[in-house]
Amino acid sequence: MVSSAQLDFNLQALLGQLSQDDLCKFKSLIRTVSLGNELQKIPQT
C-alpha cells in the first residue's frame, strides 16, 4: 500500500478546495466506509 507521503499531497489542502456540497458528499462517503468497516468486525452468527 502506498503511504500519503509517497503520493505527495496534503489532504487538508485538498479538502479546503472542495465546495460545501462536495465536502458534504465526502463526509458522507467517509461515514459509509467507516460504518462498513465497523460492521465487518462484528462476528457473524
Curated annotation (Swiss-Prot):
UniProt keyword Ligase, yes or no: no
Keywords in alphabetical order: Cytoplasm, Immunity, Innate immunity, Nucleus, Signal transduction inhibitor
One Gene Ontology term, aspect cellular component: nucleus
Function: May function as a negative regulator of NF-kappa-B by preventing RELA/p65 phosphorylation at 'Ser-536', thereby inhibiting its transcriptional activity. Through NF-kappa-B regulation may control cytokine release upon Toll-like receptors activation and therefore play a role in modulation of innate immunity. May also play a role in cell cycle progression and apoptotic process.
Tissue specificity: Expressed in all tissues tested, including spleen, lymph node, thymus, tonsil, peripheral blood leukocyte, bone marrow, liver, heart, brain, placenta, lung, skeletal muscle, kidney and pancreas.
Broad class of where this protein is predominantly found: cytoplasm
GO process annotations (BP): innate immune response; negative regulation of cell cycle; negative regulation of NF-kappaB transcription factor activity; negative regulation of peptidyl-serine phosphorylation; negative regulation of toll-like receptor signaling pathway; negative regulation of tumor necrosis factor-mediated signaling pathway; positive regulation of apoptotic process
Protein name per Swiss-Prot or TrEMBL: NLR family pyrin domain-containing protein 2B
Subcellular location: Cytoplasm; Nucleus
Encoding gene, per UniProt annotation: NLRP2B
Upregulation: Up-regulated by inflammatory stimulus (LPS).
Transmembrane stretches, start-end: none
